[in-house]
Amino acid sequence: MAAEPVEDNCISFVEMKFINNTLYFVAENGDLESDHFGKLEPKLSIIRNLNDQVLFISQGNQPVFEDMPDSDCSDNAPQTIFIIYMYKDSLTRGLAVTISVQCKKMSTLSCENKIISFKEMNPPDNIDNEGSDIIFFQRSVPGHDDKIQFESSLYKGYFLACKKENDLFKLILKRQDDNRDKSVMFTVQNQN
């Protein structure tokens, strides 16, 4: 028997079975929770790279970084204020989030096929899977109190990063090989 806490501070026991050296929980009334993400409350945020450049959505719906004073962030709020939805995760791997923007239509950041883009969609209330192209794990960076990194839930070891291409600083998905890689570090300034 395994114990699980319930709301009235009592312990409810769940039956278990060993079958072929594997432990299985026996669901009572089919109420065991499967792996999934459940949407919680959003936060409105400005995301910056370590060069203090602001992430914004370009006219082509692409995520790029640009030098921008705070007053310009306010003037361009639909393109610079991101809606970070937090999700309850049935596994413990970090704070599960989606990153969306409401600019004409709602768009949500995706790393499908390891390519960063915005999909025209509202973040779903529930995602019945343990990985998704739109879920990232937001974590603090060890040794950096105010720095955040976002790991893909679909591609373990791959993080959102800032990369200079031609004259633009783009948001990309990158395998992190080195804990000192500053391109995968961001600051998140909450607006609400």
UniProtKB/Swiss-Prot annotation:
One of its GO terms (biological process) is positive regulation of type II interferon production. GO terms for molecular function: cytokine activity; interleukin-18 receptor binding. Residues 1-35 form a propeptide. Keywords: Cytokine, Cytoplasm, Inflammatory response, Secreted. The pro-IL-18 precursor is processed by CASP1, CASP4 or CASP5 to yield its mature, active form. The pro-IL-18 precursor features autoinhibitory interactions between the propeptide and the post-cleavage-site region, preventing recognition by the IL18R1 receptor. Processing by CASP1, CASP4 or CASP5 induces conformational changes to generate critical receptor-binding sites. The mature form is then secreted and released in the extracellular milieu by passing through the gasdermin-D (GSDMD) pore. In contrast, cleavage by CASP3 inactivates IL18. InterPro entries: IL-18, IL-1_fam, IL1/FGF. It is found in: Cytoplasm, Cytosol; Secreted. Its main location: cytoplasm. It comes from the Eukaryota. It holds the Pfam family IL1. The record marks 35-36, 70-71 as: Cleavage. SUPFAM superfamilies: Cytokine. One of its GO terms (cellular component) is extracellular space. Forms a ternary complex with ligand-binding receptor subunit IL18R1 and signaling receptor subunit IL18RAP at the plasma membrane. Mature IL18 first binds to IL18R1 forming a low affinity binary complex, which then interacts with IL18RAP to form a high affinity ternary complex that signals inside the cell. Interacts with cargo receptor TMED10; the interaction mediates the translocation from the cytoplasm into the ERGIC (endoplasmic reticulum-Golgi intermediate compartment) and thereby secretion. Pro-inflammatory cytokine primarily involved in epithelial barrier repair, polarized T-helper 1 (Th1) cell and natural killer (NK) cell immune responses. Upon binding to IL18R1 and IL18RAP, forms a signaling ternary complex which activates NF-kappa-B, triggering synthesis of inflammatory mediators. Synergizes with IL12/interleukin-12 to induce IFNG synthesis from T-helper 1 (Th1) cells and natural killer (NK) cells. Belongs to the IL-1 family. This is Interleukin-18.
